[in-house]
Structures are given as C-alpha cells and as structure tokens.
Regions:
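Short, surface-exposed beta-strand/strand-loop-strand elements in extracellular ectodomains
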Residues: 73-92, 132-134
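Edge beta-strands of jelly-roll/beta-sandwich modules across compartments, strongly enriched
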Residues: 74-76, 123-143
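Transition segment at domain starts
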Residues: 23-56, 142-150
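Post-signal-peptide N-terminal segment of Sec-exported extracytoplasmic proteins
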Residues: 41-79
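Bacterial N-terminal signal peptides that target proteins for export
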Residues: 1-11
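Beta-sandwich interaction modules
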Residues: 53-56, 96-111
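C-terminal motif of bacterial Sec signal peptides marking the signal peptidase cleavage site
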Residues: 17-21
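Noncatalytic modules at the cell exterior or secretory-pathway interfaces
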Residues: 61-65, 107-125, 129
Length: 152
C-alpha cells in the first residue's frame, strides 16, 4: 500500500509538470545590453516575430553573430540600418543584411558607427542568439556561409 501511494504521488507529480510545460506561451525578445551587444531569446518564437536592438561599431572592430544557443532549425534575418531610430542620421535602408541559422556563428566587417538592428525570425525558433562587436584581428572570415553583404 505504501509503495502504491509513492507510485501515485510520482504519477501525479509527472502530470503536473507535463501540464505546466504545455501551458507556456511563445516568447520572442530582443534586448540591447550595456556591454554593446544584442541578445535574442525565444521559446517557440513564431515566424515573422521582430525586434530592434542597437549596436555601436568602433574603428578596427568587426560584428559577430552567434546563434550556437539556438535550435538548428531556427533562422534569423538581421538588417543593420545606419544611425539610431528617431535620430536625424537614421537611414531606413539597410546598410548590411545577413541571416544566421541555429547552431551557426559568423564574423563580418562593417563601417564604424551606430546601427539600429532589426531582428526577424524566419522560422519558428527556440533558444538564444547574440550579436556583438570584437576587435578585428586582420583575418575576418565567416564561420559558415552567412557572411553579411553590404546593400549599397
């Protein structure tokens, strides 16, 4: 009898955990961090979800996109517009466009300046991604085939 109560308790606990996991709503968030990086966090983020972030590229810096924390099936489209949204020097036309897939990372060069970055989910995604800058070491290459191309 004691063993049966234990089994029933464990089954009840398993059902509660399963039901609570099923109730989570999809999440897609983009945030600009104090360390001059952009974080993308998603849990079953629906296709076409969108967010904005800001990034400053200095002299002799390159942009790093890292989606190694995102599920392999996920894909993000990134558009880098020169200037800060709402400022006089903001351009609605992207200076650079690229995409990054889950599990991949890439490095590319960009002109120094401030950028408004539009992040768009090209598929349903789960996981994390990060966009940041780092000092250029003279050898800039894409980790995969997702090197950005200027749109001008």
């Amino acid at each position: 009898m004691k063993r049966m109560k234990k089994i029933l308790s464990l089954l009840l606990l398993a059902m509660v955990l399963l039901l609570s996991a099923c109730g989570q709503k999809p999440v897609f968030g983009v945030s600009t961090n104090e360390d001059n990086s952009i974080s993308i966090t998603a849990y079953r983020g629906p296709k076409d979800s969108m967010g904005l972030g800001y990034l400053t590229v200095g002299e002799n810096e390159q942009i790093v996109t890292d989606a190694t924390g995102m599920d392999k099936g996920g894909k993000l489209s990134l558009r880098f517009m020169a200037g800060v949204l709402g400022s006089d020097d903001f351009s609605e036309e992207p200076a650079y466009e690229t995409s990054v897939s889950g599990g991949d990372s890439a490095v590319f060069t960009a002109e120094p300046g401030e950028y408004t970055v539009t992040v768009i989910a090209q598929s349903n995604i789960t996981g994390t991604a990060r966009i940041c800058t780092e000092a250029a070491d003279g050898m800039v290459q894409a980790a995969n085939s997702s090197e950005a191309a200027p749109t001008k």
